[in-house]
């Protein structure tokens, strides 16, 4: 009997994270709850383990991908790779245990120059179409083809300087088209092969890249630190795209049902209009708070607050939620029980007991000795006068002192020799994990409360300040 490597989002629930991964299991749970989740399917952790063991995609998996893609096309009424009515998908990792930012994601899979041109015509928005195409080429190049970040940044910076723009998404439409072509040329030079043109090849190669990312250096480092077994593998979630970069009433965000840094009640998170999801966690642009989102999009914000309460009541815990707004419609992309600081863990557990959502015994099980030790984090003596250089967002509490270091590898090398360091970056990426682990604290000039630096620092119990806009980091 053939193994089943793929399940639609309509199958399963949150208890099946061994098979579907945490993300896939929680997506299935939300579908069962009737929440607005873009349709898709999950490739199981077993498929990943077989791929990593053999080095090739199982033949049965290839057949099941084609069948599942056909079923998804029927569900959404669009066709993958068809310029007249295109279906685009995201390809995202989803291991049993949350590993924020440690594995890979490829967005806008299925887009080609022909599809981009058709999207520009049908949406009436050239920028949206070609920005989406540029984003796909960028991600495919770095993640699938191993194009070094330095090459990507060098090409992007040349366009930014020429256009006097701060971020790539602000480039003129013609520059976005030209940038995508320059990236393709760089990919071809780097790989020695022609850039694939068939969207099915884009999809299968993206899936393989996500499988491989389970064994990336940073993923292995994170697993060792968090004591996550190395033989689990990751599931892969294929989800139909909804576009936060489509229009003025579109955007993307990350929300927590309570403050993951302090445990205070009340929604907490970041929102970016005219953006795609990776922009928020990457910290490339400074975000607006959910309170500011409420002023800009009051109806959508009210719906988000309602769904946040629904999810927290259902999970009986702090929930971390990724969402996208497309032309005023709210979509929930994923949820998980959110990582939090030790202070927040104790406060939230106490609150949930007081609210009758969990028992005292369950609250004790949710708090451990490691978190108790973290509660003793140092603080500065505020009674002494200090020269304040800059202020930012208190992403993870505590106080830290050390040499300022701008490079993660150097931070690691200095810390290995017994020197205390503060890692200072414009924004952190998953590749900075080695420096973040080594540093006493983390400071970024960009990013918000849910950026990569903030989420990872909270999970590790590291002091972090993000979005210090008055500091310029070269």
Which residues does each PLM region occupy?
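Short, flexible loop segments at the rims of nucleotide/cofactor-binding pockets, characterized by
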Residues: 401-402, 420, 442-443
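NTP/phosphate- and nucleic-acid-binding module
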Residues: 397, 401, 415
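Long, structured protein-protein interaction/assembly regions in large complexes
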Residues: 400, 404-410
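Residues forming the flavin
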Residues: 461-462
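Generic beta-sheet signal
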Residues: 445, 465-468
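Nucleotide/phosphate-binding sheet-loop regions of phosphoryl- and nucleotidyl-transfer enzymes
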Residues: 1-387, 413, 419-422, 427-434, ...
């Amino acid at each position: 009997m053939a193994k089943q490597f793929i399940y639609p989002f309509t199958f399963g629930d949150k208890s099946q994270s061994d098979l579907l991964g945490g993300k896939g299991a929680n997506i299935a749970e939300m579908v069962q709850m009737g929440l607005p989740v873009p349709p898709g399917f999950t490739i199981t952790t077993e498929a990943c383990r077989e791929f990593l063991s053999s080095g090739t995609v199982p033949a049965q998996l290839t057949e099941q991908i084609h069948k599942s893609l056909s079923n998804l096309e029927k569900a959404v009424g669009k066709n993958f790779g068809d310029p007249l009515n295109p279906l685009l998908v995201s390809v995202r990792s989803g291991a049993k245990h949350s590993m924020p930012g440690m594995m890979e994601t490829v967005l806008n899979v299925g887009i080609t120059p022909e599809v981009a041109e058709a999207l520009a015509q049908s949406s009436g928005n050239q920028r949206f179409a070609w920005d989406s195409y540029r984003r796909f080429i960028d991600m495919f190049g770095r993640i699938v083809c191993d194009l070094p970040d330095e090459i990507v940044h060098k090409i992007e910076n040349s366009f930014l300087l020429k256009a006097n723009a701060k971020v790539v998404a602000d480039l003129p439409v013609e520059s976005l088209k030209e940038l995508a072509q320059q990236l393709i040329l760089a990919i071809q030079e780097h790989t020695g092969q022609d850039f694939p043109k068939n969207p099915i090849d884009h999809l299968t190669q993206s899936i393989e890249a996500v499988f491989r990312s389970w064994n990336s250096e940073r993923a292995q480092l994170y697993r060792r630190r968090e004591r996550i077994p190395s033989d689990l593998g990751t599931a892969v979630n294929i989800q139909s795209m909804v576009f936060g970069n489509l229009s003025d009433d579109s955007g993307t965000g990350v929300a927590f049902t309570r403050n993951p840094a302090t445990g205070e009640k009340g929604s907490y998170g970041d929102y970016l209009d005219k953006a795609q999801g990776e922009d928020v966690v990457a910290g490339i642009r400074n975000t607006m708070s959910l309170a500011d989102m409420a002023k800009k999009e009051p109806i959508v914000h009210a719906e988000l607050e309602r769904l946040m309460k629904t999810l927290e009541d259902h999970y009986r815990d702090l929930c971390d939620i990724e969402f996208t707004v497309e032309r005023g419609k709210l979509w929930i992309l994923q949820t998980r029980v959110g990582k939090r600081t030790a202070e927040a863990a104790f406060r939230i557990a106490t609150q949930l007991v007081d609210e009758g959502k969990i028992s005292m015994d369950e609250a004790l099980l949710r708090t451990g000795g490691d978190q108790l030790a973290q509660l003793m984090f140092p603080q500065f003596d505020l009674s002494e006068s200090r020269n304040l250089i800059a202020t930012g967002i208190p992403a993870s509490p505590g106080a830290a002192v050390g040499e300022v270091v701008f490079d993660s590898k150097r931070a690691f090398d200095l810390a290995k020799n017994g020197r205390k360091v503060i890692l200072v970056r414009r924004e952190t990426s998953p590749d900075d994990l080695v420096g973040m682990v080594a540093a006493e604290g983390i400071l970024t000039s960009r990013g918000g409360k849910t950026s990569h630096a903030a989420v990872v620092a909270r999970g590790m119990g590291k002091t972090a300040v993000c979005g210090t806009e008055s500091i310029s980091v070269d």
